[in-house]
Every structure is written in C-alpha cells, then in structure tokens.
Amino acid sequence: MIRAVESAPHVSAPVLAAYGYCEAVTGQQARNFAYGIRLLPAPKRRAMSALYAFSRRVDDIGDGTLDGDVKTARLEDTRALLDRVRAGEVDEDDTDPVAVALTHAARVFPIPLGGLDELIDGVLMDVRGETYETWDDLRTYCRCVAGAIGRLSLGVFGTEPGARGAERAPEYADTLGLALQLTNILRDVREDAAGGRTYLPADDLAKFGCSAGFDGPRPPEGSDFAGLVHFEVRRARALFAEGYRLLPLLDRRSGACVAAMAGIYRRLLDRIERDPEAVLRGRVSLPGREKAYVAVRGLSGLDARHVSRLAVRRQA
C-alpha cells in the first residue's frame, strides 16, 4: 500500500501563498489538469499544483526560443534546485514560490521526486532534437515526460488501504501517463511539426506513407494518414485500458480526479478517431460542458466501477 498523508497540522501563510501561486499557474496553463484536481481535498490539490508548476517550468525551458546550450544549462540549474528541494534546503520565505510549495508537498506526501529528474531528462531529449525510430524508442521518452508524472501523482494520491493488487499501482500510473502522452502527441501533430519536431515513430510514419511530415492542413499526398491515426489510437486505447486498472486502487476522490483527467483525454481520442485530419487543421479540444460531464462521471465513481467490472471479467 502507498500511504498518503491527508493534511499537515499547520500550513503557514508563506507556504499557502506559494501554493496559491502554483494553483494560479495550473488554472491558467493546464485547464484539463485543473479540471481534474479540483475534485481533490485541499492538501492533495495543492500538492498536485506544486508538481504541475515545477513540471511546467521544465517544459517551458524546453519549448522556449533560447539556444540549445542555454536551455541545457537552465535545465541543469533546475535540477540543482530540485536537489535543494529533495534535501529540504528551501526555506518557506524563499523567493521562489514553486520551490517553497514543492518542498512542503514533499514533506507532507511520499512523492518520488526522482520522477522530476526523469522529466528533465526527457526535456533534454527534446533539446537535443532526438527522434524515435520505433515505438519502444518513443515509449522511453514518454515514460520520462509522462509516465514519471503518473508515478509522482501517485505519491500524492496514495492507494486505498487493503486494496488488492496495490503493489502494481506505480506500473498502472506509469502506463496511464503513457496513454495521456500519446494522445497529446496525436493532438499536437501539426503544432509539433511547425516547431521542427516529430514524435511519432519513424517506422509507423513509413508504414503509412507519412514520412514527408505534416506541414499543412492536409496529409502528405498519397499517404494513409487516417490509417496512421487509427493505428496510434488503438495503441493509446490499449494503454488506457491497462492504466485504468489504477482507479479501483485509489480512494474515491483521488479516483475521481484520475478518472476526470483521463476521461477528458479519452474523449479527445474519440474526436481524433472520428476525424483524423482535424489534428492537421488545428488543436482538437473539448467544450467546457463536456469536461464538466466527465468530472461528474468521475466523481460519481462510474468510471472506476466500469473498470472494476472489466478487471473481474479478465480474471474470470
């Protein structure tokens, strides 16, 4: 069992202010994520916002316009800051609110901070312009930038006392992170191409005649772009099916949070599957009312119960 502490006996005003900053960053920069974590009790919601704010800082360095050498130096500076957080060397009156909040969160919850080192490693792969020949290659990258986030989040959520199979929770959290990241990659195909990045495996691109890349609102001439998208959608669905085994291992509100976030991405996947070329015309997204429905469904436990029934059928 992975146990999470529900609350600290006292949270000082400077720490609360630091958390407030992180929650503002989360609300402004990650609406899907923010929709999910609003279902959590305050201590867990604050800790998740601290994780997001630190992760966002790392991502922003990688996505910025600085030279590669400067990005690398800044990422290593961020890793040094993480070392200070890990050692508990960030005081609550430090001028960096993200470091203050993350240090407090790591004291309250058993967060495996090494996952943030993995995230930095993954962004360094972006900075170096690495491409991926096979799914196994891409999977390694996805584990760094998304699977690690799943395992970090599990440190905040914890598992339900007595949950059967709880020892596999980190594995399921990792797999669910991969499912979310592959969905992101499909959604952002054109945006990434405009930035000179291609994440889909070269083997898959060649198989469906898409090696020329995606530089406009139409697929490469003569390609089977729909076939490529449907192939990757099936892969993502298999990852979701495995990752959703995490839900019955969590308490009700943590399970609702995960179900809401994952549910939003599953519905994005549905939209992409119905209209593959939509990802070349612009960013596919869900309207607020649909996100609200997903959140209610997650809070009701419908997704967790559905996954539990499927797990029982597989074991039968």
Positions of the model-derived regions?
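Catalytic cores of Mg2+-dependent Asp-rich isoprenoid enzymes
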Residues: 1-182, 186, 190-316
